[in-house]
Amino acid sequence: MFNRSDFDQLTVEEKSYCRAIGDCRGLHFVTYPSVAFQYPDSEETIRITRAPKQQGENGLKFWLHAECVDWHHERESYFVGYVSDAKFEAISEAVFNKMVAEQAHYLIAPLKQPLHEPSGFIGALLMYSMKTEFIVSLFAEYEDEYIHFYWDTTS
C-alpha cells in the first residue's frame, strides 16, 4: 500500500491530471447525484470507484485516477494542488466503514455496506475529511481490489 512518501517521490508530471486520467485497468465506478439523497438541495454527491489489484502496483496510480474520474477539464490546473494537499492518514477498516456509513446515511436507496466483505483488508487512508473541507475522500486496499470512496457537497 502507498503512503505520502511514495506520493512525494512522484514528479509534478506524474501527479498531473493528464497522467492521472491515463489507463487504469478494470476501473469502474458508480455515482450517486444529489437527487439520490433525501434532501437534494444539500447538493451531495457520492462516488465509489473500484478496480482489481494489479500485480506490482501499490494503489497510488488507482487513487490518482479515481480522484480525477469526475474532475472537470477546465479545473485541470488545480489537480496537482488538490492531490498534494491530501492527508494520507492511515485509518482502520472500522473507521473507513464508519465514515462511509456516515456520508451515505441520507441516500434514498441504502448503500450496501460494508463496501467489501470483512476479509482481506490491507489498509486504508483518509485523504480528505470534514475537518478541513466539504469533502470526504477515502482509499482502501484489500487483497483483491482497491476502493475509493468520495463524498462532497456544494452547499
Model-derived segments and their meaning:
Residues 105-155:
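Acidic, proline/glycine-rich low-complexity IDRs
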Residues 1-99:
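N-terminal "domain-start" segment
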Residues 92-112:
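Intrinsically disordered, low-complexity segments enriched in Gly and acidic/Ser/Thr residues
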